[in-house]
């Protein structure tokens, strides 16, 4: 029996247990992922093929180099994950819907049989995402729909007893980025295989962000494959440092607005006044960015600020960064040793799930 048939039969049983309300969502998730896997090509075969463009070969060699480094030097799981490649033919892999109450900075959560509760809901089809977002708006929620360039199965389908067909692939969206961002994205997705806490998106994403940041730094310092980079290694790392400085400035703006918004929502004033003050805060946030945008060195957030901002946008920034410093401190406490650090993170994860 073909591998995809086995998965479909397994998912079919889950659909029956999950009930009709989620059937459409799980079906699009399964069929979308299987459609992606059906297009996966082995990276080694692509590198050996005369039909593969030199540009793609260069990027795939960099992927192989990073993957080997993080497995050997950092101790990330050694499995069949990220040994295949998928050309998506578009600049995103899924569209993600997020939601929040209009007068509360608390993300709406969706609970899944395979991953616990998360603060987002992903769709492979953009129209499906916008249709679902419209349904959520009818519940008088703040809603946003954003493109996502990467996702992983958290290592669940990279098991040695499963056919390589199921393993997570490298996506063409990784390769559309600068080398520093490509390296960071790959490390981030591989880090999700180390630990995953049900119902705690901030823990999972902040952990992966820290691992990507430190992993990128170590790779650029210690890698001997300097011929794989676009430009020299020092320039790549300096670009990444500049990008991190830009992200910190952006986060400072968002965090300031976030804190002020919490005060407004907690105040003993009418909901109508709260909504008015909320819009005033977003207006001031845009003004603040306009006055400081020349301070950004390599990144621009102009498109982000062109959106009709709501609570989901503030929460989205918090989701990926709120606990990064905590993991950085833990790494130092473990003498910057990856095995000890990962063990300590697993202990934290186990404690939080009790």
Regions found by a protein language model. Name each.
Residues 7-18:
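Bacterial N-terminal signal peptides
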């Amino acid at each position: 029996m073909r591998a995809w048939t086995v998965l479909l039969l397994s998912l079919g049983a889950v659909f029956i247990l999950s009930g009709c309300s989620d059937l459409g969502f799980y079906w699009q998730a399964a069929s979308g992922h299987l459609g992606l896997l059906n297009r996966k090509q082995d990276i080694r075969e692509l590198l050996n093929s005369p039909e593969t463009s030199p540009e793609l070969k260069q990027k795939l060699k960099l992927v192989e180099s990073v993957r080997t480094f993080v497995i050997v030097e950092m101790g990330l799981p050694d499995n069949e994950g990220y040994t295949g490649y998928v050309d998506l033919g578009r600049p995103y892999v899924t569209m993600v819907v997020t939601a929040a109450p209009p007068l509360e900075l608390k993300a709406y959560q969706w609970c899944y049989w395979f991953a616990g509760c998360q603060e987002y809901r992903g769709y492979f089809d953009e129209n499906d995402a916008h249709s679902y977002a419209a349904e959520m708006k009818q519940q008088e929620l703040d809603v946003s729909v954003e493109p996502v360039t990467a996702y992983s199965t958290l290592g669940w389908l990279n098991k040695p007893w499963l056919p390589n067909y199921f393993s997570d692939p490298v996506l063409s969206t990784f390769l559309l980025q600068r080398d520093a961002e490509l390296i960071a994205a790959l490390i981030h997705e591989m880090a999700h295989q180390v630990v995953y806490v049900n119902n705690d998106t901030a823990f999972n994403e902040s952990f992966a962000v820290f691992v990507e940041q430190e992993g990128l730094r170590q790779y650029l310092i210690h890698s001997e494959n300097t011929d794989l980079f676009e430009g020299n290694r020092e320039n790549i790392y300096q670009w990444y440092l500049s990008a991190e400085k830009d992200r910190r400035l952006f986060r400072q703006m968002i965090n300031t607005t976030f804190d002020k918004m919490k005060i407004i929502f907690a105040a003993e004033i009418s909901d109508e006044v709260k909504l008015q003050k909320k819009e005033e805060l977003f207006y001031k946030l845009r003004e603040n960015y306009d006055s400081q945008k020349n301070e950004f060195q390599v990144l621009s957030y102009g498109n982000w600020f062109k959106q009709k901002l709501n609570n989901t946008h503030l929460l989205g920034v918090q989701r990926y960064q709120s606990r990064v410093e905590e993991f950085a401190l833990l790494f130092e406490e473990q003498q910057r040793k990856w095995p000890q650090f990962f063990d300590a993170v697993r202990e934290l994860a186990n404690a939080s799930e009790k």
